[in-house]
Design a protein with these regions (language model features):
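Bacterial N-terminal signal peptides that target proteins for export
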Residues: 4-15
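C-terminal motif of bacterial Sec signal peptides marking the signal peptidase cleavage site
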Residues: 25-28
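N-terminal helix-cap/turn-to-beta initiation motif at the start of protein domains
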Residues: 30-45, 129-133
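Short, solvent-exposed coil/turn segments at beta-strand boundaries
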Residues: 37-43, 55-63, 86-88, 104-111, ...
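Solvent-exposed hydroxyl-ligand-binding patches built from regularly spaced Ser/Thr
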Residues: 68, 72-74, 133-251
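Edge beta-strand at a domain terminus
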Residues: 77-87, 114-135, 238-251
């Protein structure tokens, strides 16, 4: 009787282990093959100084990453399939290669990605309310002040290391823009700059001035309102640098 019970107990344990192992394998497969709606239901667009970039995640698993002229960004044309791992937040590309993409955050109409160590924010091109948020006249950036920026945003408020941002065409008088506000964190030793360029009416004579400002000066610029700027992020989705932007037209 004792032997029979021991044998049945061992058999039960073996079956339980097999079932558990299969469950873990299936769960892992499910995580790595996800195609979540926050990726597939949007037309993700990144405003870049040279060419706007579109990254596409199809419901069927198709992947593409290209510029305004349809040209691939970097070596992205080596990949045409993707899957999303919800545990690691990694977007795995196929065929396997060196390109690495990780989701750092996703909020309403905003997606922050780490692409091979280059952190970029993408906006939903289907969202008409924020369609006017692209930076303008970057051809005047003769000194490459904004080169490599991660996002272009309205800076709404600052409280210590907390900073509230929104799409650059933010309208504080429109209550529907409230849902686009996002509380973000400044990295330790974040830097701030004020960049202003003067252009004459012909658009030919351009004088550009970019100077570093203190955190106190930056806070005042934000509290005075109408603060818009280029933003850089690190791999923790923390803001490392802001270049506040403005322009004047001289007679």
């Amino acid at each position: 009787m004792k032997r029979s019970f021991s044998k049945r107990n061992r058999q039960f344990m073996v079956v339980a282990i097999v079932i558990l192992a299969m469950g873990v394998m299936l769960a892992g497969c499910g995580r790595s093959n996800e195609r979540p709606e926050f990726l597939t239901a949007h037309e993700w667009l990144h405003y870049d100084s040279a060419s706007n970039e579109t990254i596409s995640f199809g419901e069927d698993g198709h992947f593409a990453f290209y510029g305004d002229e349809g040209n691939p960004v970097g070596n992205s044309d080596l990949y045409d399939r993707y899957s999303y791992d919800s545990e690691s937040k990694a977007i795995k590309l196929k065929p396997e290669g060196d390109m690495k993409i990780k989701v750092l955050r996703h909020e309403k109409s905003r997606l922050l990605l780490d692409i091979d160590g280059d952190v970029k924010e993408f906006f939903d091109g289907k969202d008409e309310r924020i369609a006017g948020g692209a930076p303008q006249n970057l051809e005047y950036d003769l000194d490459n002040v904004a080169s490599g920026f991660g996002s272009y945003l309205a800076i709404i408020s600052k409280d210590g290391s907390k900073i509230v941002t929104a799409p650059a065409n933010y309208d504080g008088d429109d209550p529907e823009f409230k849902e686009y506000e996002l509380s973000e964190k400044l990295a330790d030793h974040a830097t701030f700059y004020s960049w202003v360029y003067d252009v004459d009416e012909s658009g030919m004579d351009v004088k550009s001035n970019c100077r570093k400002v203190t955190e106190k000066e930056a806070a005042k610029m934000i509290s005075d309102g109408a603060a818009v700027g280029f933003v850089w992020y690190n791999e923790k989705a923390e803001i490392t640098k802001i270049v506040f932007w403005g322009s004047t037209v001289t007679q």
